[in-house]
């Protein structure tokens, strides 16, 4: 075997899992859950009693944290569900490009240029208007399961 036969795919993450298991019976309202491979925020949980043949079941109603779609799932309360690692990070807004991407300043001084402006009209208007007025804006970015989206805005004051 020569050295040339060893090719390894480089991945962006260091093997860190995008989700972790949690027993269905312990997931509460306002928690997070993966339904149909989408990260969701739980808005309603109801539990049914154990039947003649089976486990108690948890009925989850949840909203996709990126698309806002309502999803539902029913899981036996003793089974494990996938729970996404959801992070919120604040970045300072530096620039908005013509093609709808934002340029953000990270904590360590690098720029992050791979995020689009949000699709939410109210948030989009706040960002564009605030930037046009020259305000110092900090954007909250939510990330889960390899996806990122701008989800909030803070006005730090004039530049």
Curated annotation (Swiss-Prot):
Lys-52 undergoes hypusination, a unique post-translational modification that consists in the addition of a butylamino group from spermidine to lysine side chain, leading to the formation of the unusual amino acid hypusine. eIF-5As are the only known proteins to undergo this modification, which is essential for their function. It comes from the Eukaryota. SUPFAM superfamilies: Nucleic acid-binding proteins, Translation proteins SH3-like domain. The keyword tRNA processing does not apply. One of its GO terms (molecular function) is RNA binding. SMART domains: eIF-5a (SM01376). The modification Hypusine is found at residue 52. InterPro entries: IF5A-like, IF5A-like_N, NA-bd_OB-fold, Rib_uL2_dom2, Trans_elong_IF5A_hypusine_site, Transl_elong_IF5A_C, Translation_prot_SH3-like_sf. Keywords: Hypusine, Initiation factor, Protein biosynthesis. Residues 1-12 have a biased composition (Basic and acidic residues). Residues 1-23 are annotated as: Disordered. One of its GO terms (biological process) is positive regulation of translational elongation. Translation factor that promotes translation elongation and termination, particularly upon ribosome stalling at specific amino acid sequence contexts. Binds between the exit (E) and peptidyl (P) site of the ribosome and promotes rescue of stalled ribosome: specifically required for efficient translation of polyproline-containing peptides as well as other motifs that stall the ribosome. Acts as a ribosome quality control (RQC) cofactor by joining the RQC complex to facilitate peptidyl transfer during CAT tailing step. Belongs to the eIF-5A family. There are at least two genes for eIF-5A in tobacco: 5A1 may regulate the light-dependent translation of specific transcripts while 5A2 may be a housekeeping protein. This is Eukaryotic translation initiation factor 5A-1.
């Amino acid at each position: 075997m020569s050295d040339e036969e060893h090719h390894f795919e480089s991945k962006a993450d260091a093997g860190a899992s995008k989700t972790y298991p949690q027993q269905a019976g312990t997931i509460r309202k306002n928690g997070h859950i993966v339904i149909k491979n989408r990260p969701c925020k739980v808005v309603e949980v109801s539990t049914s009693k154990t039947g003649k043949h089976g486990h108690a079941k948890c009925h989850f109603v949840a909203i996709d944290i990126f698309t806002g779609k309502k999803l539902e799932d029913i899981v036996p309360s003793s089974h494990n569900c996938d729970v996404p690692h959801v992070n919120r990070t604040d970045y300072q807004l530096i620039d908005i490009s013509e093609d709808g991407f934002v340029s953000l300043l990270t904590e360590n001084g690098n720029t992050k240029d791979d995020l689009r402006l949000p699709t939410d009209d109210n948030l989009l208007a706040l960002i564009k208007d605030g930037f046009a007025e020259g305000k110092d804006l900090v954007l909250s970015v939510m990330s889960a399961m390899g996806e990122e989206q701008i989800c909030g805005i803070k006005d730090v004051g004039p530049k």
